């Protein structure tokens, strides 16, 4: 998610809360004098829902930013070495798919520095991986 998308989302939430807070809500009266019952939603009732929506959007943005810095090939290789494949595919960033699957109010913890992308270049699916461990370590995949 980009910064412009987050700004638009916050602006939309603010406009919605203003409209709900100050919008005129009157019972509809027909020509016979009987009014229908209208369910009035007050701003106090929607504050929690608005806070949850903004928190979910912030969680998705944080998760996307952290996942962009991950080396998916190294994560997948590590999973196979541990005997538990992580099923991460080297298709590229999966941040939109991951953000859509986030449970409410969840945040991704900091990704281990070992699995971040190399500063020396390298794309998804390269044969040589340089891990950011502070030491000069390269793993060659045959």
UniProtKB/Swiss-Prot annotation:
Task: Note the Pfam families from the entry.
Answer: Chorion_S16
Q: Name one GO biological process term.
A: chorion-containing eggshell formation
Q: Does the keyword section mention Secreted?
A: yes
Keyword check for Lipid metabolism, yes or no: no
Q: Which domain of life is it from?
A: Eukaryota
Q: Where is the signal peptide?
A: 1-21
Q: Which UniProt keywords apply?
A: Secreted, Signal
- Give the UniProt subcellular location, in the record's own words: Secreted
Which GO cellular component does the record give, naming just one? Answer: egg chorion
| Role, per record | Chorion membrane (egg shell) protein; plays a role in protecting the egg from the environment.
Family stated for the protein in its record: Belongs to the chorion protein S16 family.
Protein name, as recorded: Chorion protein S16
Starting at the broadest rank, the lineage of the source organism is: Eukaryota, Metazoa, Ecdysozoa, Arthropoda, Hexapoda
